[in-house]
Regions:
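A recurrent domain-boundary module in secreted/ectodomain proteins
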Residues: 1-4, 161-167
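Ser/Thr/Gly/Pro-rich low-complexity, disordered linker/stalk segments of secreted
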Residues: 1-25
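Short beta-strand/loop segment at the start of cytosolic alpha/beta domains
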Residues: 18-55
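Structural signature of tandem-repeat unit edges
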Residues: 42-45, 58-80, 90-103, 113-127, ...
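Acidic, Ser/Thr
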Residues: 53-55, 69, 84-86
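Consensus positions within tandem repeat domains that build extended binding/scaffold surfaces
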Residues: 83-84, 105-108, 130-132
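A structural signal for leucine-rich repeat
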Residues: 131-135, 154-159
């Protein structure tokens, strides 16, 4: 892999990484852009999972999990968030989850005590892992697509989201 830093993408929705040639399932991709360093794991043909995010600047407070990224000359859909991906993040206050995410791993956002605003754009989430949202701010609001409100409320409650958190 190249040790050169890539230039931030012109489109803030798709951070890029250097072209490293062929990318295989299981391989880890690091993308550094204007929002920080994102680490992804290739999960299938054209799909990746967020492993971790080291945000910088204003992005430390407002974290975005992108719909897709560009890496190795290819566009990848971000379809899942790994277990423990942002567990214990002390600065994150808001989180936006992209429209292609289908799975959120266990403890993904657990103990993010300052997290007050979660926006889920995806209409495809089928799995939210155990304790994924445990111990986020008790005054938090989770905004979900209207058609998925009932389904997501059930999934979020199973994931130990506090009963005090509002689901809109």
């Amino acid at each position: 892999p190249s040790t050169e830093k890539e230039t931030p993408s012109t489109n803030p929705q798709t951070p890029e990484t250097p072209n490293d040639g062929t990318v295989k399932v299981g391989q880890v991709i690091k993308a550094e852009g204007q929002y920080g360093v994102f680490t992804y794991k290739v999960t299938g043909k054209g799909t990746v999972e967020v492993k971790s995010i080291t945000a910088k600047g204003k992005a430390k407070k407002s974290v975005k999990i992108f719909d897709k990224i560009k890496a190795s000359g290819k566009t990848w859909k971000v379809t899942s968030v790994a277990a423990n991906a942002l567990k214990g993040n002390k600065k994150m206050e808001s989180l936006t989850i992209g429209k292609n995410v289908r799975k959120i791993g266990k403890n993904a956002f657990a103990n993010c005590r300052k997290l007050k605003k979660v926006t889920i754009k995806s209409k495809k989430i089928n799995t939210i892992g155990k304790n994924a949202f445990k111990n986020i701010n008790k005054k938090a609001t989770v905004k979900v697509p209207k058609a998925q409100k009932k389904k997501y409320a059930k999934l979020l409650n199973k994931a130990k989201l506090s009963k005090k958190v509002k689901i809109k």
